[in-house]
C-alpha cells in the first residue's frame, strides 16, 4: 500500500478536480473495479453512496457509468454514512459497496472507500490489483457507449433499524439532553432521529448541509462549538460525528473531550463488568499511554495495530477479539459491524449511561490520558524527511529527554501530503517544546 499511486490508508482521497479526483478517473476506476468483480450468472450489483459534498453526485454518476461498461449494475443510495455502506453491502449481498467521501476533510476534497461483499474494507492485495489494472488500462475511446445500469434506492430506514438493533429494546434516554453535531455530513438525517426515538431531548448542530459546509467549523475535527452548546444548554453530553459518520468524539457535561481511547475504555469496562469481554482490546500506535495503563490495571490485554481502522480490524480477527478503536474516533465493535461506526459506538455509550444511571464524566474516571500534542507538517508527496539524519538525530535526542515517560511517533499520512508528529508524556510543557523542535527539524529538510 505504501507504494501505491492512488490508495492510501483509507481508500483514495485528494483535491476535487485534480487527478485522481476527477470524473474521468472515477469512470476508469468503475470500469476496472467492474472487470475485477464481474462474474457470469452473479448478482453483479454494487452499492454506491456519498456524503453531502457537492462534488459527490457527478463522481458517483461517472463511477456508476464505468461499472456499467464492465457489466455491473449500481444501486445509488444517495447521502448516507460510510459505515451504512459497509452494513448494507453485506446485508444485500452486493458484490461491493463504495462510499464517495473524503471523511473528515473539507468539501474541497473528495475520495472513495471500497467495501467487499462481506462489508469489510478491501485488502491491501485487492487495492494493489486495482492499481495494477489502472496502470495497464489503455485510453478508453471517447465514443464508448454502454447502457447505464443503475437504480436509485432509499435504504436509510434499513440502516436506522440496524443501528437501533445494536442496543437493548428497553433502552430509554428520556431526560437526557444531548447536543448532536453531524458535521453537515451524512449522519444529519439519521442520528438526531434515532436519539429522539429513544427519548432523548436533542439539540442539533451541523444538520444543514449545503454541499459546501461539510466539516466546516464543526464535526469531530472542530468541537469548539459543540462544547460551547453543551455548556450553554446545560446538556448531559455532546456527540460529534465526522462528515461520513465513521468517527465519533464526545463531550461530557463539564465540557471535557472524550475521544476514541476513552470510548474504547468505557465499552471495555462495561463488557468486563458483564463478563462479555472476549479476550482483550486493540488500539493503534496513536493510542494514548493512559489507555494502556488503565487497561493493565484491569488486567485487560491490549495490543497496538498499525494506524487505520482496517488494521485494527485485522488485529482483532487475528486475536479473536471483539473491540478496538483509534483515538481519532474510529470504534470497531465486531458484535455489530466490521468497520468504524460513529452512530453505533455512540449508542453503546448512551446505553451504558442509561442502564447505570451515571454520567459520561463518571465513566471516564478510571482513565487518565497523558498530555499529547499533534503537529502536521505539509510536504511534497515525493518528499520523505523521515529519512533525514537531521530528523533522526532530533528524534533520538527527544526520546532520551522523555526518559521512558512518554512516546514519540512520526509518520507520513496515508491520506494527505503531511508528516504527522505526535509527542506524548507526563509533562505538558516538555512535550510541547519537543514536538515543535521536531517539527522545525522536519521543515528544515523539506
From Swiss-Prot:
Organism (species): Wigglesworthia glossinidia brevipalpis
Residues of the active site: 103 (phosphoserine intermediate)
Post-translational modification Phosphoserine, affected residues: 103
Cofactor: Mg(2+)
Catalytic activity: alpha-D-glucosamine 1-phosphate = D-glucosamine 6-phosphate
Post-translational modification: Activated by phosphorylation.
Record-given protein name: Phosphoglucosamine mutase
GO MF annotations, alphabetized: magnesium ion binding; phosphoglucosamine mutase activity; phosphomannomutase activity
Cofactor details (free text): Binds 1 Mg(2+) ion per subunit.
Keywords for this protein: Isomerase, Magnesium, Metal-binding, Phosphoprotein
HAMAP family xref list: GlmM_B
Gene from which this protein is expressed: glmM
Family statement: Belongs to the phosphohexose mutase family.
Family matches, as CDD domains: GlmM
Family annotation (PANTHER family): PHOSPHOGLUCOMUTASE (ALPHA-D-GLUCOSE-1,6-BISPHOSPHATE-DEPENDENT), PHOSPHOHEXOSE MUTASE
Enzyme class: isomerase
EC number assigned by the record: 5.4.2.10
